[in-house]
UniProtKB/Swiss-Prot annotation:
Protein name: Large ribosomal subunit protein uL18
Regions annotated as coiled coil: none
Record lineage: Bacteria, Pseudomonadati, Pseudomonadota, Gammaproteobacteria, Lysobacterales
Record's keyword terms, sorted: Ribonucleoprotein, Ribosomal protein, RNA-binding, rRNA-binding
Range of residues in the leader sequence: none
Length: 119
């Protein structure tokens, strides 16, 4: 990823996070790397992580060839929804961190919705 492309992604993410902060709801944030996918649910003010899931965890790794495809994203999405609901969070704002809503990001979001989270 070139520097300019990454800076543009971070600029989009900053704008989105400012809007989510005004809404005052919990935030489901996603980080995508070349090999793995991470998801975290933050409090409304962003000061505390309520739930987290990623492709490095043993319960997600089981049965997956690698952590960089849509199948892994679906597992992470279902797991983050389960953990957020266990913590009492039903409604979240989806922070895609400046990534396009496509591929792994979309798969994670759809799986989290199926798991019971409302965006």
């Amino acid at each position: 990823m070139s520097i300019n492309k990454n800076i543009a992604r971070l600029r989009r993410a900053k704008s989105t996070r400012a809007h989510i902060r005004e809404l005052g709801v919990a935030r489901l944030s996603v980080l995508r790397t070349g090999q793995h996918l991470y998801a975290q649910v933050f409090t409304a003010d962003g000061s505390k992580v309520i739930a987290a899931a990623n492709t490095l965890q043993a319960d997600v790794k089981d049965g997956l060839k690698n952590g960089k495809n849509s199948d892994a994203a679906v597992k992470v999405g279902k797991l983050i929804a389960e953990r957020a609901k266990a913590a009492g969070i039903e409604k979240v704002a989806f922070d895609r961190s400046g990534y396009r809503y496509h591929g792994r990001i979309k798969a994670l979001a759809d799986a989290a919705r199926e798991g019971g989270l409302q965006f």
